[in-house]
């Protein structure tokens, strides 16, 4: 049997001694094998190593051979439950180590690209962006971008105008596959740091190398002995804690560095251009505020989330301020101080006599240290109040509690807004400047305050549209209107809603016992009002309406906002930005019509926030990738979103309204995922104009934000793509011929996709039986149910995340490519010469190139031999014929799609032009196969016993009659394989 090292020696395409990624994979191989040999019984360790080596040696062109499959299956089926769980843990550990390694190498490459002063030069007669366009996975840095813009003669004024208006918002969301224990996360960080030290081996002595490798092995051994799974269903606040980890550990310090890098690049290429505002890139969150289909997200949870976020920021500011106090030891004996700072010290002395008494002697000639002592006290008092608010809840009578606790000093002396904190820091900064001093730590802290404030991230409320219409229906039933709300036409609803919005009298009686659902709908708006009163409008000012279908959906939310005091009729200002989310293909097509109705309403336009120097109204619109893909397939979803953006931007321009598009992208290709740089460049010309909002799904947070340089790389990539799209993408607009071709491809692919997914009566049974979807929905991995409606088993009730997740686990990855081959084939059958046009599109149109690139990457991860095993082993006998037919349809479409993708790209094999990606995918495809077979084995055992329930909870394994085991053990094993496959695929649902 070949080992990894033998393959390394025999296959130069797989590994290279000169490649840091390949070189360090050998370190991971040795580490993994060494840990298994020390932690597992000898025969078990050798069997696991044998499984992995089999994986390396017997795979053919991305699909496992049948002979190889049988060898793996024999080993897997010979394992008892304990051995199966050990195998699942071992392979999951392996992939997590590989992920850490790849992140470290990506981090190093980014550092090299940033520190390399030699920007790739382009001949003057060529497009300066051509090299980046040719290298599909090579985003540009700030330095490269501004150099190339200068070569294109982009005027400084045009660039400055864009930078001043630039508004990039990254919104973190929760995800059911990424609930990792803090303990495991910390171990991953320590492993990454040790790898970083080992990778600078040229500076290490022999003893240092040995010591580091020993530490690394011991860390992984501790990891192996640590329970990687939660023993309980994670709460929403657990998910909040998970997402905030990245802010606390990485992003807080990364943001000043991002500003430093754009400053340096502008200074080199556009020295006269004014820097963008510090907050040109900021953050939002749905974790703790997205209540669409998640009954666990209550008003109290959202309130506590806001308090938790403020607590985190106050903790960081206290540490930073304390460090500043240590650093700013400037003495009045040797330096002047501004009069403004001295005056503020006198004011603070009166307010904080205890601080003055305690610190005045020590800092009598060190005014900055004294000022920072006062700032620290204000921050601590703000923290004290925040703790009180978190404990009290959003409904509490705060004044009474504060008086009762005899801490009314908090009321007077804490920071009532982040502006007061900013003012104090600006006093210090300006005083230093006035005496010809600068302090990077002060500047960095101010940047952090401008970006994060006290809120850290804005909480977007999200709720499904029918919750509001149902509440208004219950209200109108109580009011006994002559025509009930649900009996009104859309035009009648709009008229009635506008009339009520213009009426000052309250509509909702205060003394009615509403149903629980309606009462909670009302309470959300009341809680938002209380949040804004306490935290400021920044903490929560966007209300996303999922499944938006009509203009009345938005007006209903505005009416409820008005009733709860979030809309000022006199000034015609709304404290909520109402954001429609158009998700299905039909809703995307209808979106321009819906928004046109609203833009024609003067009352509606007057409520839109006015932004920028132009003081134009701003409308935010969200586009859903997940449900449109689930509804109509990959090509149709992407094309309808593309078309909707153009139509909505044209509509907004005609109405003199600014548009901010909110892209609801998932981590997987089937939910809009993929490289952010290519995705942003592929947006239609003229639709960004420096403004974009994007979801960052929980499943991709670790790969993007776990390491400081990786976080900077992602932030710089997004920013450069937005600037590039906004300034130069107009030269890459599609022609009418291209648009017509794409419309035909979208329609044909949609028809073929829906024929299988929505029209084949056996597809749902196929999905439920041959993927782990039912087990996924039962596992303790998310606070959010897998289905929108409790107990429902139909496809429409299933959420997009588990839909994609199930297909990914079983190696079909169907939502990301099915229908593409049939659409391309139909086009070529009608005119074989169209292949040349398709190749031109692939070379010249970022949108089409992005589509083909995503399909190619996804196809490279499909393994039909493994998928076939899921069908044969998990499919019921009575469904064998229909399931075989479905598999044949899928297999035929896969082969057709693959052949046509290769023909368009001019390649012989998938990914052959991207060596790094090909190497990574090849390694994963090989090593992940045993996990798939392990998963099938565990699912088969579990389902066999479920069909014939035993008397007790403990089940006798027919392959292991000597011991009993419980359903919980089987579920545990299944969860370990699910997590392992998710880690191996690097994108899940």
Curated annotation (Swiss-Prot):
Domain of life per record: Bacteria
Single GO molecular function: phosphoenolpyruvate carboxylase activity
Record's signal peptide: none
List of catalytic residues: 175, 630
Alphabetic keyword roster: Carbon dioxide fixation, Lyase, Magnesium
Protein's UniProt keywords contain Magnesium: yes
Class of this enzyme: lyase
E.C. no: 4.1.1.31
GO biological process, one term: oxaloacetate metabolic process
Catalysed reaction equations from the record: oxaloacetate + phosphate = phosphoenolpyruvate + hydrogencarbonate
Pfam family, one: PEPcase
Statement: the UniProt record of this protein carries the keyword Nucleotidyltransferase: no
CC annotations in GO: cytosol
Entry cofactors: Mg(2+)
InterPro entries hit by this protein: PEP_COase, PEP_COase_bac/pln-type, PEP_COase_Lys_AS, PEPCASE_His_AS, Pyrv/PenolPyrv_kinase-like_dom
Functional description taken from the UniProt entry: Forms oxaloacetate, a four-carbon dicarboxylic acid source for the tricarboxylic acid cycle.
Family as reported in the entry's similarity comment: Belongs to the PEPCase type 1 family.
Protein name: Phosphoenolpyruvate carboxylase
């Amino acid at each position: 049997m070949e080992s990894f090292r033998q393959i390394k020696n025999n296959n130069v395409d797989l590994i290279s001694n000169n490649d840091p990624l390949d070189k360090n994979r050998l370190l991971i191989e040795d580490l993994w094998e060494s840990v298994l040999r020390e932690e597992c019984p000898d025969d078990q360790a050798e069997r696991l190593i044998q499984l992995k080596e089999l994986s390396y040696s017997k795979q053919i062109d991305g699909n496992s051979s049948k002979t190889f499959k049988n060898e793996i299956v024999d080993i897997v089926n010979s394992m008892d439950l304990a051995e199966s769980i050990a195998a699942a843990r071992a392979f999951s550990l392996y992939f997590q180590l590989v992920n850490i390694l790849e992140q470290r190498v990506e981090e190093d490459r980014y550092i090299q690209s940033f520190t390399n002063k030699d920007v790739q030069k382009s001949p003057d007669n060529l497009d300066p962006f051509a090299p980046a366009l040719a290298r599909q996975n090579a985003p540009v840095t700030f330095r490269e971008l501004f150099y190339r813009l200068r070569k294109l003669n982009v005027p400084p004024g045009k660039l400055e105008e864009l930078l001043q208006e630039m508004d990039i918002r990254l919104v973190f969301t929760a995800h059911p596959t990424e609930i990792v224990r803090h303990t495991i996360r910390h171990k991953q960080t320590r492993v990454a740091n040790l790898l970083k030290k080992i990778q600078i081996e040229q500076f290490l002595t022999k003893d240092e190398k040995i010591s580091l490798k020993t530490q690394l092995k011991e860390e992984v051994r501790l990891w192996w002995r640590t329970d990687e799974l939660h023993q309980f269903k994670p709460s929403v606040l657990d998910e909040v804690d998970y997402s905030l980890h990245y802010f606390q550990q990485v992003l807080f310090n990364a943001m000043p560095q991002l500003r430093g890098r754009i400053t340096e690049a502008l200074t080199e290429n556009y020295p006269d251009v004014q820097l963008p505002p510090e907050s040109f890139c900021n953050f939002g969150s749905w974790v703790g505020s997205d209540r669409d289909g998640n009954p666990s997200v209550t008003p109290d949870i959202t309130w506590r989330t806001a308090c938790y976020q403020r607590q985190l920021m106050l903790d960081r500011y206290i540490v930073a301020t304390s460090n500043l106090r240590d650093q700013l030891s400037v003495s009045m004996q040797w330096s002047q101080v501004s009069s403004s700072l001295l005056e503020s010290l006198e004011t603070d002395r009166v307010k904080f006599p205890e601080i003055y008494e305690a610190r005045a002697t020590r800092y009598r000639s060190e005014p900055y240290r004294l000022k920072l002592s006062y700032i620290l006290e204000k921050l601590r008092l703000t923290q004290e109040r925040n703790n009180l608010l978190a404990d009290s809840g959003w409904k509490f009578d705060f004044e009474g509690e504060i008086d009762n606790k005899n801490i009314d000093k908090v009321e007077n002396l804490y920071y009532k807004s982040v502006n007061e904190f900013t003012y104090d820091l600006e006093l210090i900064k300006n005083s230093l400047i006035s005496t010809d001093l600068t302090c990077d730590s002060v500047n960095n802290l101010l940047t952090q305050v401008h970006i994060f404030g006290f809120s850290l991230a804005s909480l977007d409320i999200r709720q499904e549209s029918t919750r509001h219409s149902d509440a208004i229906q219950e209200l109108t039933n109580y009011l006994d209107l002559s025509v009930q709300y649900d009996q009104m036409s859309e035009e009648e609803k709009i008229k009635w809603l506008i009339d009520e919005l213009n009426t000052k009298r309250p509509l909702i009686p205060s003394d009615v016992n509403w149903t629980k659902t309606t009462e909670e709908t009302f309470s959300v708006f009341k809680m938002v009002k209380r949040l804004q009163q306490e935290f400021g409008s920044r903490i929560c000012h966007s209300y996303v309406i999922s499944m938006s279908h009509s203009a009345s959906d938005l007006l209903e939310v505005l009416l409820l906002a008005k009733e709860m005091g979030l809309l000022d009729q006199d000034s015609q200002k709304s404290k909520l930005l109402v954001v429609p989310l158009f998700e299905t293909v039909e809703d995307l097509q209808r979106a321009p019509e819906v928004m046109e109705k609203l833009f024609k309403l003067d009352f509606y336009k007057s409520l839109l926030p006015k932004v920028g120097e132009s003081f134009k109204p701003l409308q935010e619109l969200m586009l859903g990738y997940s449900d449109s893909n689930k509804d109509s397939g990959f090509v149709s979803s992407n094309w309808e979103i593309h078309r909707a953006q153009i139509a909505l931007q044209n509509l907004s321009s005609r109405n003199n309204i600014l548009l901010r598009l909110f892209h609801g992208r998932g981590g997987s290709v089937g939910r809009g995922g993929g490289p952010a740089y290519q995705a942003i460049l592929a947006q239609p010309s003229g639709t960004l104009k420096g403004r974009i909002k994007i979801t960052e799904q929980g499943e991709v947070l670790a790969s993007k934000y776990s390491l400081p340089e990786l976080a900077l790389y992602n932030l710089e990539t997004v920013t450069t793509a937005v600037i590039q799209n906004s300034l130069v993408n107009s030269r890459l607009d599609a022609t009418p011929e291209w648009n017509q071709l794409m419309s035909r491809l979208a329609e044909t692919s949609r028809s073929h996709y829906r024929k299988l997914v929505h029209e084949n009566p056996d597809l749902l049974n196929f999905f439920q039986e041959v993927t782990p979807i039912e087990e996924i929905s039962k596992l303790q991995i998310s606070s959010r149910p897998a289905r929108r409606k409790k107990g429902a088993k139909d496809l429409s009730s299933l959420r997009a995340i588990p839909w994609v997740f199930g297909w990914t686990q079983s190696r079909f990855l169907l939502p990301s490519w099915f229908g593409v081959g049939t659409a391309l084939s139909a086009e070529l059958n009608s005119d074989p010469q169209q292949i040349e046009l398709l190749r031109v599109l692939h070379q010249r149109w970022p949108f089409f190139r992005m589509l083909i690139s995503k399909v190619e990457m996804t196809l490279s991860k499909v393994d039909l031999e493994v998928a076939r095993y899921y069908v044969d082993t998990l499919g019921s006998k009575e469904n064998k014929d229909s399931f075989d037919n479905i598999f044949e349809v899928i297999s035929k479409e896969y082969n057709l799609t693959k052949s046509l993708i290769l023909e368009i790209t001019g390649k012989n094999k998938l990914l052959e032009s991207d060596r790094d990606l090909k190497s990574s995918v090849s390694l994963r495809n090989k090593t992940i196969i045993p996990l798939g077979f392990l998963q099938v084995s565990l699912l088969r055992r579990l389902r066999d016993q479920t069909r014939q329930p035993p008397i007790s909870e403990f089940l006798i394994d027919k392959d292991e009659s000597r011991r009993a085991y419980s359903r919980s053990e089987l579920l545990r094993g299944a969860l370990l394989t699910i997590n392992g496959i998710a880690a191996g695929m690097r994108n899940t649902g």
